[in-house]
Amino acid sequence: MNNNRINIILNGKNVKAQEGERLVEIIQRHNIPLSAPCYHRSLTETGHCGLCLVGARRKVTDKFSVVFACTATAKDGMEIDTEYKEAVDKRNELFRLHLLRHPLDCSKCNKVGYCFLHKFASQTRFPGFTRIAKDHPQDIKYKKFGQHILFDATKCIGCQRCIRFCRDVLDEELLGLIGNENGYGEIDLYPGKSLDNNYSLNLVDLCPAGAFVNRNYLYQPVEWNLISTPSISTESSVGINTYVLHKGNKIFRIKPRENKYVNDAWMTNSARNEHRYFENRKRLTKIMQNGQQVPLESALLQIVESFQTNELAVVCSGNMSLEDQFVLRKLLDSIIHNVFFLRKKMTPDGFLISDDATPNVNGAILNKITTQEKIVDDLKELTEKIQTGQCKRILSFNEEIFSHGVPYALPDDLKIFYIGTENNKTSKRAMVAIPVTTVFENTGTFINRDWRLQKFHKAVNPPNGNIFPMWYIFSLLLSVYLDVSKKELLWLDDVWKNMTHTVDVLADIDFFHVNPGGILLKNYLK
């Protein structure tokens, strides 16, 4: 497809399009109902289902012919008619065949509310939708295709999206089409193959009719009954765009949010379980001082006292949001300190997992908390400073220092202060521990590995009212330390406004309305 703009006629109206653009994309862009279950922008086109048939002609003087909207491309002067009678009749006949094979168990189907068959019937007011398949057996017989994937052949419409995903995206031949006893083609695994890779659950999202099921969601609320909130995965610096699906302050699942610049329409299986990480680990929910619960003011005063010494070490990583890092930078400018910025390594897969297991290292570099050269792999240098008496205070921001080289046996005069989400060894050893919100309980931004600024939104509330965002705690610490009566940066709006006024790269960015696809900061960086 090239960038030449052309004129075409769509259902009697003159519209603009790009030369070589798929007809189905033009039709959908103009909000004209047309089902194309086998078509996906990120997969090779095939025309398997035949439900996107439309009438088209090269010139007004030509006769209409029936074409597949998912494979046919736009040419200057072309006329398209989605209501061309011959095309409509063929679409309806093919749709009727799909319904004859499809079970009417919509109330139990995990795709309810998002099923292409239901949507097509509703849009076209297809007659007899609830009667055609009345005698179809209702027993669900799942095939196990992998550790997390179940397959219900009775719901399969033969679109072959799953086959093309494995071939086009995973570059593997895992699924194929075989004949069954009813004379229909049926999806099945190749001998010796299984869907146990880290991207297999994308088939559940891809399937338009609910044939693929995530076995973990079999007995959970269906998607249409959940609230969907845009977010960003913290699994790695890729910054996969996601939707967090929740209800009643509980997260039930995470699914991919399409962004052609970052993750296309896909995500890893491991990123879908990020909310379980916080559920399965002990959460820090109380403000603690020497093992006793205390008011926030008391804990802040204890931490501020540590700012008076030049023997203070700050431990952090790219797990913090851009807002956290911005206010932290203001705090660090006021105190004498040594910063140990940790690199969190992981094994990259060459696709949606990078070698950096944190979402916002570039944000720390932008806020001048660290540089690429100063990032450390462990805390051996900090351990040496502790042993030689050069470090008497450690301020850890959501970091488990004992898993990065610091011995648990420490001098009696060493004091640890912890601000984070987990009730771990560091928080238990700390003189003061203050809980903060997770990415699911907060609104903010990350800068991914490609310097794309991306926004995440608050989905659920923290466990109690005494848990605040990390940037808010930093703002309070700054106010207490500077002993100012007028507290600043206590609202997210104030933080965003300060960022645009202080950081040149962010000067023209409206944080209140960040594009869902993000903003590429490389265009701003010199």
Segments predicted by a language model, with ranges:
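N-terminal cofactor/phosphate-binding cores enriched in small/glycine residues
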Residues: 6, 11-76, 85-90
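Fe-S ferredoxin-like electron-transfer domains
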Residues: 50-233, 238-242, 250
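Cofactor-/ligand-binding subdomain signature composed of acidic, glycine-rich
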Residues: 135, 245-310, 352-353, 357-365, ...
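Phosphate/diphosphate-binding loops
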Residues: 198-256, 398-400, 407-424, 459-475
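Glycine-rich phosphate/diphosphate-binding loops that line cofactor/substrate pockets in enzymes
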Residues: 299-313, 382-392
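Gly/Ser/Thr-rich loops at beta-strand to alpha-helix junctions
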Residues: 313-324, 400-402
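Non-catalytic alpha/beta scaffold blocks inside enzyme catalytic domains
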Residues: 331, 335-508
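Long, low-complexity segments enriched in small/aliphatic residues
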Residues: 496-526
